[in-house]
Amino acid sequence: TTNTLKSTIRNTSIAIVTSAAFMLPMFAWGAENCDKPNNDFDGLYCLTKVYLEADKELNNSYSKLSKLLNKQQKATLKRGQLAWMRERNDQCSYNDGDGFFVNMSCATNKTANRVNFLNERVRECNAGSCRDSRLDD
């Protein structure tokens, strides 16, 4: 359901944003140059900034595409988005009992690829050639 998707997106985003909110101020002083981070924490700070921007783009692209679709197409898109989120989470994060770990580089790459995918669907729909079969990819 729509509530499940929103809840999943919200919970994932809250976990990442909350982590970022605590990390960013602590590491900002040492990460002036994301080209050459001084240490792993500076690198994580830089990756988190890029991930948060990709996540924002993902939400915007999903919203843009959703506005172009009818009710049935929206349901198909939602199924595809939930499947993509499960795949991203399975491939980019894990919980080993001691904590929850996210590979930010993996999450960022998967998210950027999904943004591109959604933007391709937006272009197709704007051109009058929405392909329903691609909405749940």
How should these model regions be labeled?
Residues N3-A20:
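Bacterial N-terminal signal peptides that target proteins for export
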Residues K6, F27-A28:
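A subset of signal/propeptide-processing and intrinsically disordered low-complexity segments
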Residues M23-P25:
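N-terminal signal peptide c-region/cleavage motif recognized by signal peptidases
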Residues A28-D137:
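N-terminal alpha-helical modules
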